[in-house]
Structure formats: structure tokens, C-alpha cells
């Protein structure tokens, strides 16, 4: 098995791999949607699969690895060929035993598993690199600066399909969890509405639900269930609207700043538990809270450190004893600093000797977040769920929006490119996820009706 898989991966050269990944519209499925073909242009010594899936309510990657182990390993080999990497690492948690058992007998030379503890935020790209390789990415730098390219499980599986079948990204696997009748992990057409996705899980079980796109720590508030599934939709979390996780996300920025100025006690727990600070970054959330509260404390260099915040939300959801959100403050600062084209430059300090002991055990995190009553297994189903309407966002990735290459009224088939980015621009094409008629084209999306 190992020999056959290794031989198959040698059928394609680096340029072919990158071209097919680009044509298929593969983007980072676990983050902001960085185009995968651009990452594969880097030349590094290590390709790392971030399979930690540290958000406690999401159950996608851990289950996909168990049932698609061969495809995942072939994808790692294609990525290694494209990047020139000599080493491939799949970093996953010890508790993912089904995945470990499926992957271990298939590992070829040059690819290994790295077992992670069940802590948050082990799935943060920079933290995963540190835990799996011992290398520390400097603040404001990319993983390539330390010789590593990182993708998550679903991205690597999409790379395999793109290379072997020239199959574009038209489906997304996501978890529906929390206050739903049937917690589930399922694969749906890109562009299906979250309203339909919720119905597939049996609907909400509370009278006045709130919704989060993604996990409880980093996911954003959903204001409309008509929002379509995109290439980066990680999950649909349903909770009572009265739940603290929903209420915090509903706070406006003025309230966030007012709370910070009123109750901050300068205990510095937010900094002591900040994962980026622990590995040597200059970022100190308590000093940034102080800076927005008291102008005389706001030096230019201090404010710029906000640009290095990963928005992992440890400071707000775990560290702060009085309900302040340093993360939201950092997000505001980042928006203003980026609007002025400011960039951060600063040192990589020695890592904290207590760093590995200050990451948050996920069991404790679930309790701290008030999720014990809403935490479910959400088993994976391989059912193909159809839909009669898809709304395909033209910007499901970092970079320029895709430009429609079809006309209203045109018949399209699943897998057909309906929008692409200009040559040389950062971005990724968008493909039809169902057969149908283009019913509407706007600046933001293309709507396809089955027919």
C-alpha cells in the first residue's frame, strides 16, 4: 500500500500540481481562505497538516481523516512535491484514535504523525508549528519564514481531488452542533443556505436561538440564516440567544470599550495566558487595554503589536475575570492600523518557560464557555444532500473577488467555472455546485437555480 501510494504521487510534477490546484479553486478551508496554489509555490523543508481542530464543537477534520486516510496522505505527498519539502507532518490530537489508527499503517517514508495534547489553541497555525517542529514563527511573519507550509485536512483532501481528478471545490463538510435536534457533520453543496443546513440537523431545539459561523472561540455571529455556505464555513453552532457566547458577540464596540475602561483591574492574566505572548511575541493584551483607556500609555510600537493578535479569544473567554474583551479591542486597533497601511516590526523574544503548561485543556474550556449541555459528538454522514438553489459568493478567499464568466439565464453544470480572478491576481475561481440556470448575478454573488 505504501509503495503504490508513493508511486502514484510521482506521476505529477510540481507545476502540474500547482496548476490543477489553482484551476480547482482550492483555498485554505480552515482559516481565511488563502489560495492553496499560492502556498504551494513556496519552497520549504516541511509541509505540515494542521489536523488539531481545536475548536471544541467542530468534528470535521478528525472524522474525515479516519475515513479518507489514503487520500489525505496522497495529498500530503502532492504538497511535498510542489513545495520541495523533505518532511511531511500530520499534527493531530491523541484523542483522535480512529484517525491515528487509520493513518499509521499507511505512512510512507518522509511522513510522520505528531501527537498533540488536547489543549486550546493547538490548532492555531503558529502554535501548531511550534508544538510539532519546535520552530517559532516571528511576529507578523509567515510560516514559510521558518521553512514550513501549513494546510488543514479538508484543504489537503481538496488538493488530492484537484490533482488526481481535476475536480473543483463544490462541496464543504461542516459540523452542525449545539441546540439542534440531530447534531451532525455533513457535506453540502457550496452556496446552500445555512437555513437549509440547519433543517438537515432537525432544526433548533430552543425557542430563541442564536447562531455562530464556526466554533465557539473564533466563530462570528450569524445575523441571517440566508447566509450561504462558503469554502471556509467551518460549522454552524446553535445556542440560546441568552447564552454568554451570543451576548458577547452582540455587544457593540462602544460597549466593549466602555467595559474595558470601567472594570479593568490590570491583573495581566490576559497576557499571561496569551498564546502568542507565551512563545515570545511582544503582544501584551493588558498593555493594549491600558493604551486605549489612557492615551498617555499608548506608544506607537505598543499599538502596532495589536497587528500580531491571532484573535484566538483566550483573553476574553478564559483569562479575564471581569468580562473585558482584549481581543475585540485588538480587532478595532487592527482595522484602524491597516487602514493607515501600518506594519508591525518587532523582536521574537525567548519563549515563556511555562508556555506549554498555560495552554487551555479543552475539557476545562468547554466548562468555562458554558457548553457542557450543548456539546455533542456530531457523527459524520456521507449522504449527498441536494439543494435547489445555491448562492455562490465571489469572494470566498483572500485576495480579489472572482469575476463572473457566465451570463444571467445561462445553463451551468456542476463543476463548471462560473467566476475567475484576473491573471496574476491573488484569488481563486468559483465553480457551480449544482446543475441549473444562472438566475442572478450581483457584485457579491452568483445565484444558480436547479433546472
UniProtKB/Swiss-Prot annotation:
Domain (4Fe-4S ferredoxin-type): residue spans on this chain: 255-284, 300-330
Known outcome of mutating residue 315 to A: Colorless protein, no 4Fe-4S centers, no cobalamin reductase activity
Residues annotated for [4Fe-4S] cluster 2 binding in this entry: 309, 312, 315, 320
Effect of residue 270 to A: Colorless protein, no 4Fe-4S centers, no cobalamin reductase activity
GO molecular function: 4 iron, 4 sulfur cluster binding; electron transfer activity; metal ion binding
Protein localization: Bacterial microcompartment
Family membership: Belongs to the PduS cobalamin reductase family.
Entries under PANTHER family matching the protein: ION-TRANSLOCATING OXIDOREDUCTASE COMPLEX SUBUNIT C
Subunit structure comment from the entry: Monomer, forms a complex with PduO. Interacts with PduT, probably via the N-terminus of PduS.
Name of protein: Cobalamin reductase PduS
Biological source species: Citrobacter freundii
